[in-house]
């Protein structure tokens, strides 16, 4: 199963976990969003902090998502995006 299909199938679980950890407005970017992921690709998620983040944020969210998906996950907070990569990340980003 492609990673993109897995994200679509687990969308509600992913959004629930994000909210539990104080995150929202979840977008996928990188190879998965472009449709050129490989079996060893990680899942790149762009998020906003929408509530009160947990004390281990975003590490706890990453751990929960990796357990759920069985894939490596990278979480990037939108407001923390470096200007060096901002344009390319936002160009790729698509709503979960």
Segments predicted by a language model, with ranges:
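Catalytic core of pol beta-like nucleotidyltransferases
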Residues: 1-27, 33-39, 50-96
